[in-house]
C-alpha cells in the first residue's frame, strides 16, 4: 500500500469520525460529508476501499469502503477495465472468506448486496466459476454458509422478479443471459440446498457423540436451516417442479411443520409451492403430497409452544390449507378423484372456520365459497359438512370479539390482530358480508335444507323464550344472538324468494313436497304469534322474524290478519317511562321496528294488503287520538299510509287522502307564528330558545315548539319523498306527457301543495344557511354550542366505535336540537329536490333562478362540506336531471358558475390540506383525519356524479358555457390529483366522458383549460405513480387530449417540452409518427414509449415478491371466489 493511499485512508477515517461524533459542529459534519461523497467519485476510489477492507478493523470504516465499491459497481462498473473488475471480485470473495461470526450484520448485508450487484453485471459470461467458489466458501464455517445462502436468496429477486431498480439496470439481453445462467445452475444449486438441509437437520435431530452440540451450536443450526428455508422461498415458485420433486422438498416441507423452529418457514414455502403457475393437471400433481401428509397438518396445530407464536403459525397454515383446497377445487373435474385424506382435510377446515379468531377463520372462507359452488363433488358426508358450515356461520355472525372488550376468547385474539375497535369493526363488517354470501350459495343450491336449519334454530330459541317469559331483560350478548338468528332467517328467505326457481310454491301447502317444511313453519309462526313478552329485545326479535316471512304471506294471504293482529298492538309498546335509559332505547327500537316492518311488508305485497287498508287506517287514527305515539312514530305511520295511498286507483282519491292528513300540517306550516320563526336567524333562534341555557326544566312551550317544527317538516318531507303518481291518472284527463325526455303517467297529487309549502321551505333553507355564519353562531348560548357539531351516532361508526345511546354524556336537549337542525335541513333539501322530480310545477316559476339563489344556493360560504354534499345530492342533481332543455340556459347560467366554483374551491383546498398534512407528517386528532376527510371524499364524489349528469343530460349547454366548464374542469383536475383510489377512479371515468364523443371540446375557448390544465394534471399523476392499476386509464386520457389538440394548439406540446429529455426535435418526430399512425393500438404504443423510455416515467406495475408479502388481512380478499373454469392459476389471485 503506497503512502498516498494510506494518507487518503487516514483522511477518510478522520472524516467519518467527525461525521459520527456528537460533539462535531454542523460545519465539520457538512465538510466531512462533502469530502466523503467526493471520494466515492474518484477514478481510483476502489483502491482506497480495498486497502481499508484488507487492513482495517474499524466497522464504520469498512462499511464506508463497501459503499465506495457499491457506488462503483452501480454507476461505473462498465467504465472499469478488466483488471480492476477482477480485482474487485477477488477482494469481495476474500472478504467473504475472512468474515467472522462477530462481524456486524450491516457489513454482512452490504457485502451480499454488492456481490449480487456484481453478479447481475458479469455472471455467467465473465465469472464462470462463481457458483463453485461460493459453495467452497460456504464450507468454511456457518457464517460463510449463511452469507452464501443470503446471496443465493437475493439473486432471483433482482432477476426473476421485476423490481424498480432492476428494470433501470438490466437490459433485455442481460436479463436473458442471467435467466439462462440461473436456469442452468438451478439443479446443482438445489443439490447443494438439499445436502445442506439434510446435514443440518440430521445434526439438529440426531446429534451423534462425535457431533455433540452445545445450546449455542443448536441455536446456530436452527438459524441456518431457517436461512435456507428463506432462500428456498426465492426459488420455489418458478423452478421446474421436477427439481422440487427430485429432492422431495414438498415432502420435507410437510414434515418440517411438525418442528416448532422450522414450521413457519416450511409453511411459507408450502404456500408458494401450492401457488405455482401451471396447467390443471400440473397443479393437481402439486397437491398430492400435502394431502398424503394431512395427518401432519392435523398434528402440527396440536403442538403448543408459545401462545402468540402458535397463533401466528396457525394463521399461516390456514392460508396454506386454503390454497391447497382451492387449487384442488379449481382443477377438479370428473377425471380426478377425491384426494387422499380429504375427510381429515375438511375436518381441519371446519375447525379453522370455527376458530375464535375472526381473522384466522376468515382465511378459510374463500375455500368454503368455492367448495359449495362445486356441485359435482361426490362425498357421502357432504350434507353433514354443509350443515356444520351453516352452524358455524350462525355462531360467527354474532358480533363478538371487540379487542377493547377482553371478556371473551374472541377478544383475546382480536387484541393481537387489531389495534383498535375501529379496525376490528371495519374488518368484521366485511367478513360478516362474506358469511351471508356463503349462506346465499347454500340457500340457492339447497334451499330446503337451509330453511329447515334456520327455522329449527329459530323455533328452538322461541321455545326457550316461551319457557322464560318472566325474564326482566336480556344481556347484550343474548340480544346479539337473537339478532343473528333473525338476520340469517331473513337472508335465507329472501334468497329463496329472489334466486330459486318456483319460489312462490315454497310455502304452498298443497304443492310443497316436504311436509316438514310446512309443519316447521307453522310451529315457528304460532310461537311468534303466541309469545307476549314485556322484554323489548325479545319483541323486536319476534317482529324481525315475522317480517322475514313475506314469501309465506304471499302464498298464504289469510295469515296477514294474524300478522296485523300481532304487530299493530306492538306500536305503542309500553316502557318509555322506565327510568333505565338503556331499556327506554330498546322500547323505542321495538316500537319503530313494528312500524317499519309494516311498511316493509306493505311495500312488498301491497296488492295483498289492500283489503286491510281501512283497518290499518282506523288503527293509526286511534293511535293518534289516544296520543300514545311519539312525533317520530307519527311520521313513520304517515309513511305506512302513503304506501297504501300509492295504490289508490285515481288522482282525486289520492289527493283527497293527502288533504285529509296534510291540511292541519300545512296550516301550521303557513301560520304566522311559524312563518315568522322561519324568516330570519334571529327569529329562528328566539322561537327555538337557542339563546337560553340548557336545562332539564325547560319551559313546556319551548319543548312543544321544538318537537312540533321537527314533526311538521318531517311530515312534509316524507310525503314529498314517498308519494307516487296514481297508475290510473290518465283515465281522469291527465294524459301521459314527456318532460325533458322523462315520461310521466300523469300529475303528481303531492305537487298540488307546492305553492303552500315552498315559500316556507325556501325561507327556512336560507335561515339555516345564515345560522352557520359566525355572527349568528355567536348568539347561541355556550351550553348549546355543540349543536353545530356532528352527532356521535354519525362519528362513532366512522371512527370504528360502537354507538350506544346510553353511553352518551351530553344533554338530551343538545342532542335533540342538533337532530332538529339536521332534520330541517334534510327536509328542505329533499322537498326542493323531489319538487324538481315532480314534473313542471317548480320549473313554471318565472323567477326560479333568483328564487333558488336567494334560498337553497345562498350563503354557501357559510355551510359545511357535509351540508354541501347534501345540497348537491338532493337538489343540484335533481335540477340537472329534470330541467327542460329549453330552460337550461335560463336556469343554469345564474346558478352553476357560482355553485361549481364553490365546489371546486372546497375540493381543491380540502385535498391540498390532506396532502400538506401527509408531507409534514402531522398527526391531527382522529376526527379531522377520518370524519372530515370522509366528508371531503363524499363531496368530491357527489361533485363528480353531478359533472357526469350534466355532461350526459345537457351537453349542448355545458359546452357553450366557459363560465361553467372552467370550474368544472378545475374541479375534476383537483379530484384527479386527490390521490384517493375511489375518487381517482370516478374522475377518470368523468374525464373520459367529457373528452369522448363531444367534438365541442375542440372549441378554442377550451384549449388551455383541457389541453394545459387537465393534460398537465394527468402527467403529474403518472409521475407520482401511486396508483399503478390506473396507469393505462391515465395514459388513455393523455392520449385523448393530445390527439384532439396537438394539431390545433400548442398547449399539450408546451407541457411535454417542460419535462425531462423532451426536446423540440424529439417532439416533432413524435408528432410525425402520430400523423402516420391511424390505429388506436399503435398510438398507445407511441405514447407509452414517449412517457416511459424518453421521459422516464415508470409505467410498469411492480410485482409483489410473493403472496407472503401481502398483509394477512388482505389474504381473504385476494383468494378468488370464481369457479374453476374462470381461473387459470392460483398466482393470479394475488396479483
Swiss-Prot record:
<keyword id="KW-0811">Translocation</keyword>
<comment type="function">
    <text>Mediates the nuclear export of proteins bearing a double-stranded RNA binding domain (dsRBD) and double-stranded RNAs (cargos).</text>
</comment>
<feature type="domain" description="Importin N-terminal">
    <location>
        <begin position="32"/>
        <end position="117"/>
    </location>
</feature>
<dbReference type="GO" id="GO:0005049">
    <property type="term" value="F:nuclear export signal receptor activity"/>
</dbReference>
<comment type="similarity">
    <text>Belongs to the exportin family.</text>
</comment>
<keyword id="KW-0813">Transport</keyword>
<protein>
    <recommendedName>
        <fullName>Exportin-5</fullName>
    </recommendedName>
</protein>
<dbReference type="Pfam" id="PF08389">
    <property type="entry name" value="Xpo1"/>
</dbReference>
<feature type="site" description="Pre-siRNA binding">
    <location>
        <position position="706"/>
    </location>
</feature>
<keyword id="KW-0694">RNA-binding</keyword>
<dbReference type="InterPro" id="IPR013598">
    <property type="entry name" value="Exportin-1/Importin-b-like"/>
</dbReference>
<dbReference type="GO" id="GO:0005634">
    <property type="term" value="C:nucleus"/>
</dbReference>
<feature type="region of interest" description="Pre-siRNA binding">
    <location>
        <begin position="630"/>
        <end position="631"/>
    </location>
</feature>
<comment type="subunit">
    <text>Found in a nuclear export complex with RanGTP, exportin and pre-miRNA.</text>
</comment>
<dbReference type="GO" id="GO:0006405">
    <property type="term" value="P:RNA export from nucleus"/>
</dbReference>
<dbReference type="GO" id="GO:0006611">
    <property type="term" value="P:protein export from nucleus"/>
</dbReference>
<dbReference type="GO" id="GO:0000049">
    <property type="term" value="F:tRNA binding"/>
</dbReference>
<dbReference type="GO" id="GO:0042565">
    <property type="term" value="C:RNA nuclear export complex"/>
</dbReference>
<keyword id="KW-0539">Nucleus</keyword>
<dbReference type="InterPro" id="IPR011989">
    <property type="entry name" value="ARM-like"/>
</dbReference>
<comment type="function">
    <text>Mediates the nuclear export of micro-RNA precursors, which form short hairpins.</text>
</comment>
<dbReference type="Pfam" id="PF03810">
    <property type="entry name" value="IBN_N"/>
</dbReference>
<dbReference type="GO" id="GO:0031267">
    <property type="term" value="F:small GTPase binding"/>
</dbReference>
<keyword id="KW-0963">Cytoplasm</keyword>
<dbReference type="Pfam" id="PF19273">
    <property type="entry name" value="Exportin-5"/>
</dbReference>
<dbReference type="InterPro" id="IPR001494">
    <property type="entry name" value="Importin-beta_N"/>
</dbReference>
<dbReference type="InterPro" id="IPR045065">
    <property type="entry name" value="XPO1/5"/>
</dbReference>
<dbReference type="GO" id="GO:0003723">
    <property type="term" value="F:RNA binding"/>
</dbReference>
<dbReference type="GO" id="GO:0005635">
    <property type="term" value="C:nuclear envelope"/>
</dbReference>
<dbReference type="GO" id="GO:0005829">
    <property type="term" value="C:cytosol"/>
</dbReference>
<dbReference type="InterPro" id="IPR016024">
    <property type="entry name" value="ARM-type_fold"/>
</dbReference>
<dbReference type="GO" id="GO:0005737">
    <property type="term" value="C:cytoplasm"/>
</dbReference>
<keyword id="KW-0653">Protein transport</keyword>
<dbReference type="InterPro" id="IPR045478">
    <property type="entry name" value="Exportin-5_C"/>
</dbReference>
Amino acid at each position: 500500500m503506497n503512502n498516498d493511499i494510506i494518507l487518503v485512508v487516514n483522511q477518510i477515517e478522520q472524516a467519518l469520525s467527525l461525521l459520527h461524533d456528537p460533539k462535531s459542529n454542523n460545519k465539520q459534519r457538512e465538510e466531512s460529508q462533502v469530502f466523503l461523497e467526493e471520494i466515492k467519485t474518484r477514478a481510483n476510489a476502489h483502491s482506497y476501499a480495498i486497502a481499508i477492507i484488507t487492513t482495517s478493523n474499524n466497522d464504520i470504516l469498512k462499511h464506508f469502503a463497501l459503499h465506495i465499491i457499491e457506488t462503483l459497481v452501480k454507476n461505473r462498473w462498465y467504465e472499469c477495465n478488466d483488471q480492476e473488475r477482477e480485482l474487485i471480485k477477488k477482494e469481495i470473495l476474500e472478504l467473504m472468506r475472512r468474515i467472522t461470526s462477530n462481524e456486524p450484520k450491516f457489513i454482512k448485508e452490504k457485502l451480499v448486496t454488492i456481490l449480487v450487484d456484481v453478479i447481475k453485471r458479469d455472471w455467467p459470461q465473465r465469472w464462470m466459476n462463481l457458483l463453485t467458489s461460493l459453495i467452497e466458501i460456504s464450507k468454511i464455517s456457518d457464517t460463510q454458509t449463511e452469507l452464501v445462502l443470503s446471496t443465493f436468496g437475493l439473486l432471483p429477486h433482482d432477476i426473476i422478479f421485476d423490481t424498480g431498480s432492476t428494470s433501470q439496470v438490466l437490459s433485455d439481453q442481460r436479463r436473458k443471459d442471467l435467466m439462462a445462467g440461473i436456469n442452468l445452475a438451478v439443479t446443482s444449486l438445489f443439490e447443494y440446498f438439499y445436502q445442506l438441509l439434510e446435514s443440518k437437520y440430521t445434526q439438529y435431530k440426531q446429534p451423534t457423540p462425535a457431533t455433540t452440540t452445545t445450546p449455542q451450536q443448536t441455536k446456530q443450526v436452527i438459524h441456518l436451516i431457517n436461512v435456507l428455508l428463506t432462500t428456498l422461498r426465492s426459488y420455489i415458485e418458478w423452478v421446474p417442479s421436477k427439481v422440487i420433486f427430485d429432492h422431495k422438498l414438498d415432502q420435507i416441507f410437510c414434515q418440517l411443520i411438525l418442528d416448532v423452529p422450522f414450521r413457519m418457514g416450511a409453511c411459507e414455502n408450502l404456500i408458494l409451492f401450492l401457488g405455482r403457475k401451471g396447467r390443471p393437471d400440473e397443479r393437481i400433481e402439486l397437491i398430492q403430497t400435502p394431502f398424503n401428509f394431512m395427518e401432519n397438518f392435523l398434528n402440527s396445530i396440536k403442538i403448543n409452544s408459545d401462545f402468540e407464536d402458535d397463533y401466528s403459525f396457525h394463521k399461516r397454515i390456514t392460508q396454506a390449507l386454503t390454497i391447497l383446497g382451492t387449487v384442488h377445487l379449481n382443477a377438479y373435474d370428473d377425471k380426478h378423484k377425491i384426494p387422499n385424506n380429504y375427510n381429515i382435510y375438511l375436518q381441519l377446515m371446519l375447525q379453522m372456520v370455527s376458530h375464535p379468531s375472526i381473522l384466522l377463520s376468515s382465511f378459510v372462507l374463500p375455500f368454503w365459497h368455492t367448495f359449495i359452488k362445486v356441485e359435482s363433488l361426490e362425498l357421502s358426508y357432504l350434507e353433514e359438512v354443509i350443515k356444520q358450515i351453516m352452524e358455524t356461520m350462525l355462531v360467527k355472525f354474532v358480533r363478538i370479539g371487540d379487542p377493547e372488550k377482553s371478556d371473551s376468547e374472541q377478544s383475546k385474539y382480536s387484541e393481537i390482530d387489531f389495534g383498535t375497535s375501529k379496525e376490528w369493526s371495519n374488518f368484521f363488517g366485511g367478513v360478516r358480508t362474506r358469511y351471508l354470501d356463503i349462506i346465499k350459495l347454500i340457500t340457492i343450491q339447497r334451499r330446503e335444507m337451509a330453511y329447515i336449519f334456520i327455522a329449527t334454530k329459530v323455533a328452538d330459541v322461541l321455545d326457550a323464550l316461551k319457557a322464560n317469559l318472566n325474564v326482566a331483560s336480556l344481556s347484550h350478548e343474548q340480544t346479539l344472538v337473537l339478532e343473528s338468528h333473525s338476520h340469517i332467517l331473513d337472508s335465507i328467505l329472501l334468497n329463496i324468494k329472489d334466486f330459486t326457481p318456483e319460489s312462490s310454491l315454497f310455502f304452498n301447502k298443497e304443492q310443497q313436497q316436504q311436509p316438514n317444511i310446512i309443519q316447521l313453519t307453522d310451529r315457528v309462526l304460532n310461537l311468534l304469534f303466541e309469545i307476549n313478552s314485556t322484554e323489548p329485545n325479545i319483541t323486536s326479535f319476534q317482529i324481525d322474524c315475522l317480517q322475514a316471512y313475506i314469501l309465506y304471506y304471499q302464498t298464504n294471504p289469510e295469515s296477514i290478519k294474524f300478522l296485523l293482529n300481532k304487530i299493530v298492538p306492538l306500536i305503542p309498546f309500553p316502557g318509555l317511562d322506565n327510568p333505565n335509559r338503556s331499556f327506554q332505547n330498546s322500547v323505542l327500537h321495538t316500537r319503530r321496528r313494528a312500524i317499519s316492518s309494516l311498511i316493509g311488508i306493505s311495500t312488498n305485497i301491497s296488492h295483498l294488503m289492500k283489503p286491510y287498508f281501512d283497518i290499518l287506517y282506523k288503527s293509526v287514527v286511534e293511535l293518534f287520538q289516544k296520543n300514545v305515539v311519539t312525533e317520530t312514530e307519527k311520521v313513520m305511520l304517515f309513511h305506512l299510509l302513503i304506501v297504501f295511498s300509492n295504490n289508490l286507483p285515481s288522482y282525486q282519491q289520492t289527493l283527497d287522502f293527502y288533504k285529509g292528513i296534510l291540511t292541519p300540517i300545512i296550516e301550521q306550516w303557513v301560520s304566522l307564528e311559524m312563518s315568522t320563526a322561519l324568516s330570519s336567524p334571529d327569529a329562528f333562534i328566539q322561537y327555538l330558545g337557542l339563546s337560553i341555557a340548557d336545562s332539564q326544566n325547560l319551559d313546556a312551550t319551548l319543548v312543544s315548539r321544538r318537537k312540533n317544527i321537527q314533526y311538521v317538516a318531517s311530515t312534509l318531507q316524507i310525503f314529498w319523498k314517498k308519494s307516487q303518481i296514481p297508475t290510473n291518472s290518465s283515465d281522469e284527463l291527465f294524459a301521459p306527457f314527456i318532460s325533458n325526455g322523462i315520461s310521466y303517467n300523469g300529475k303528481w297529487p303531492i305537487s298540488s301543495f307546492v305553492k303552500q309549502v315552498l315559500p316556507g321551505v325556501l325561507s327556512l333553507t336560507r335561515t339555516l344557511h345564515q345560522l352557520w355564519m359566525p355572527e349568528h353562531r355567536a348568539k347561541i348560548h355556550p351550553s348549546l354550542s355543540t349543536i353545530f357539531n356532528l352527532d356521535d351516532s354519525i362519528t362513532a361508526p366512522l371512527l370504528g366505535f360502537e354507538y350506544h345511546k346510553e353511553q352518551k354524556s351530553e344533554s338530551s336537549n343538545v342532542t335533540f336540537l342538533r337532530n332538529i337542525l339536521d332534520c330541517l335541513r334534510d327536509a328542505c333539501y329533499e322537498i326542493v329536490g323531489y319538487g324538481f322530480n315532480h314534473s313542471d310545477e317548480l320549473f313554471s316559476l318565472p323567477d326560479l333562478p333568483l328564487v333558488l339563489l336567494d334560498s337553497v344556493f345562498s350563503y354557501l360560504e357559510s355551510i359545511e362540506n357535509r351540508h354541501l354534499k347534501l345540497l348537491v345530492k338532493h337538489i343540484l342533481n335533481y335540477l340537472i336531471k329534470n330541467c327542460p332543455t329549453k330552460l337550461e340556459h335560463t336556469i343554469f347560467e345564474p346558478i352553476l358558475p357560482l355553485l361549481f366554483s364553490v365546489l371546486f374551491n372546497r375540493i381543491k383546498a380540502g385535498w391540498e390540506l390532506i396532502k400538506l398534512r401527509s408531507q409534514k407528517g402531522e398527526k391531527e386528532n382522529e376526527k379531522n383525519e377520518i370524519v372530515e376527510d370522509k366528508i371531503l371524499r363524499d363531496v368530491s364524489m357527489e361533485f363528480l356524479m353531478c359533472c357526469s349528469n350534466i355532461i350526459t343530460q345537457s351537453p349542448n349547454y355545458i359546452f357553450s358555457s366557459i363560465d361553467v366548464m372552467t370550474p368544472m374542469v378545475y374541479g375534476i383536475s383537483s379530484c384527479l390529483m386527490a390521490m384517493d383510489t375511489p375518487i381517482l377512479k370516478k374522475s377518470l371515468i368523468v374525464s373520459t366522458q367529457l373528452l369522448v364523443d363531444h367534438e365541442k371540446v375542440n372549441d378554442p375557448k377550451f384549449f388551455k383549460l383541457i389541453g394545459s390544465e387537465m393534460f398537465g394534471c394527468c402527467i403529474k399523476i403518472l409521475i407520482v405513480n401511486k396508483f399503478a392499476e390506473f396507469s393505462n386509464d391515465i395514459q388513455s386520457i393523455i392520449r385523448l387530449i393530445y390527439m384532439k389538440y396537438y394539431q390545433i394548439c400548442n398547449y399539450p406540446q408546451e407541457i411535454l417540452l417542460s419535462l425531462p429529455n423532451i426536446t423540440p426535435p424529439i417532439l416533432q418526430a413524435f408528432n410525425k409518427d402520430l400523423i402516420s399512425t391511424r390505429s388506436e393500438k399503435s398510438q398507445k404504443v407511441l405514447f407509452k414509449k414517449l412517457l416511459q423510455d424518453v421521459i422516464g416515467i415508470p409505467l410498469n406495475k411492480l410485482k409483489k415478491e410473493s403472496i407472503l408479502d401481502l398483509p394477512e388481512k388482505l389474504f381473504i380478499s385476494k383468494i378468488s371466489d370464481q369457479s374453476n373454469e374462470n381461473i387459470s392459476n392460483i398466482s393470479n389471485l394475488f396479483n
